A protein has these predicted regions:
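Acidic, polar-rich low-complexity tracts and alpha-helical solenoid repeat scaffolds
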Residues: 1-166
Length: 166
């Protein structure tokens, strides 16, 4: 994965970093890697837009490994799958569960940012989006999304954004 992380392709590099973090966060916590294998297969199904198959595998993980550390990643992947299908409220529900049950985990700030983005750009609920962005700023000050979040808050407030900030 280190070679992929150094790739010049931003998307490939970001995907490699995301995968590396997910593996580091969940690998080796138990000696049974079946849940990780099922998760990987479900992730592939999402990429192939085979959502029912993916969700079936996610359900199998939840049933067979109810306290596995992949639980927050499963919610995140479900939310992303809902976004791919244009099911914005369902995506928001999954993101909300991440914040509610895994608020201090690595995906909490991602879930808040994605929620605010959906509220702002897909559902045109600017006040709720603004509140969600503010929550991200206060609860996750070290987030990688801080710079973009500040820009969006200023824009939603109607403040002037300098050219270099765009």
């Amino acid at each position: 994965l280190d070679v992929l992380k150094q790739s010049t392709s931003k998307l490939l590099s970001n995907d490699a970093l995301e995968l590396s973090i997910m593996i580091t966060d969940n690998y080796g916590l138990d000696s049974n890697y079946i849940a990780m294998a099922w998760f990987s297969k479900a992730d592939l199904y999402i990429e192939q837009l085979q959502f029912d198959k993916a969700f079936s595998l996610f359900d199998s993980i939840r049933i067979n490994y109810p306290f596995h550390s992949l639980s927050d990643e499963i919610l995140y992947k479900r939310a992303r799958a809902m976004e791919l299908q244009g099911k914005w409220q369902s995506a928001l529900d999954f993101y909300s569960d991440i914040v509610k049950f895994y608020g201090t985990d690595i995906l909490a700030d991602n879930a808040l940012f994605k929620s605010a983005e959906i509220l702002e750009t897909k559902l045109n609920q600017t006040e709720k989006a603004l509140d969600t962005y503010k929550k991200l700023l206060t609860e996750h000050p070290g987030s990688l999304y801080i710079y973009e979040t500040r820009k969006r808050v200023r824009r939603l407030r109607g403040e002037e954004i300098e050219k270099e900030d765009e």
